[in-house]
Amino acid sequence: MSVWAIGDLQGCYDITQRLLEKINFDPAQDTLWFCGDLVNRGGQSLETLRLVHSLRAHSVVVLGNHDLSLLAIGARSEEEQRKVNPDLLRIVLAEDRDALLDWLRMQKLAHVDRALGWMMIHAGLAPKWTTQMAEKHAREVEQQLQGGGYRKLLRNMYGDQPGWSPGLIGYDRSRAIINLFTRMRYCTPRGRIATDDKGTPGTQAQGLYPWFEVPGRVERDLKIVCGHWSALGLTITQGVHAIDTGAVWGGKLTALQLDTDELRVVQVPGREVTGPAPVARAPRRPRERLGRQRSRGNRGNAGNTAVPAKPQVDTPQD
């Protein structure tokens, strides 16, 4: 039995299939951990969502910002839904949309396997959160998403504020938790997220740190695997294993085997990108735009590679 974590799919169905073939995925005995952002940008979001849904008995999914955006779109009126990009529109108009979206809404913000020694999230954790605290806060939002009032949560999750504070209540608290789990890259030592900084470490504004390198952060008792930050490439440092290697931007799609003493990395080439990368959008209201986010992903060979002794950090695609 093998356990594989897989980076952001972002609607790249054909590439996902190639990666599953390359790792010789056997649903009878293997398990897949998907790091979130199953959909958007890749042009095959419906096919990708159907594929992961079909593997639901053999996989674990954590929600990314694009997955939450899809859920919010699905909860809107038909008139509003028709204004979204064609890739996501195909999902909300599909005959099996209810089955797909209801299943997606039941997925986690954080997955923990203490026997295996791993936690999976999409983006990041607050500097002072232990893994136990992260689980607790994830469950708070998951219960809302899975309950009858989920539409109100999806309407109220947008925005950059407030920053995390243990005393937050209501939708402010839920929004802060969602932002940490699904949008985090850089933050201050107090855990304030910087949403405008998306490049490689060293390009951020003064006073900001990658969330996994913040001074004074707590020691965590589990290894962490995550996606979201494609500009990093394959990065393994401080007990964090970032595996979004920019498949949708022309990089690679990465699988990381979690159940071996020596971590094994398998990659396949990502989507061919011939024109400018589309504008990246976080889960905000449609009128708000974010800056461009591009990456070549990991520049290493697209095969089975050992984890580098020194973290490999890639630069964004120009």
UniProtKB/Swiss-Prot annotation:
The GO terms this record gives for MF are: bis(5'-nucleosyl)-tetraphosphatase (symmetrical) activity
What UniProt keywords are attached to this protein's entry?
Answer: Hydrolase
Catalytic activity as recorded in UniProt: P(1),P(4)-bis(5'-adenosyl) tetraphosphate + H2O = 2 ADP + 2 H(+)
Q: Where is this region: Disordered?
A: 269-318
Q: What is its EC number?
A: 3.6.1.41
What's its top-level EC category? hydrolase
Source domain of life is Bacteria
Q: List the disulfide bonds.
A: none
User: Spans of biased composition, class Basic residues?
Assistant: 282-297
Q: Which CDD domains match?
A: MPP_ApaH
Q: Which Pfam families match?
A: Metallophos (PF00149)
Q: Where is the signal peptide?
A: none
What family classification does the UniProt entry report for this protein?
Belongs to the Ap4A hydrolase family.
Which PANTHER family does the annotation name? CYTOCHROME C5, PTHR40942
Q: Per its database record, what is this protein's job? A: Hydrolyzes diadenosine 5',5'''-P1,P4-tetraphosphate to yield ADP.
State the name under which the record lists this protein.
Answer: Bis(5'-nucleosyl)-tetraphosphatase, symmetrical
List the lineage, top down.
Bacteria, Pseudomonadati, Pseudomonadota, Gammaproteobacteria, Lysobacterales
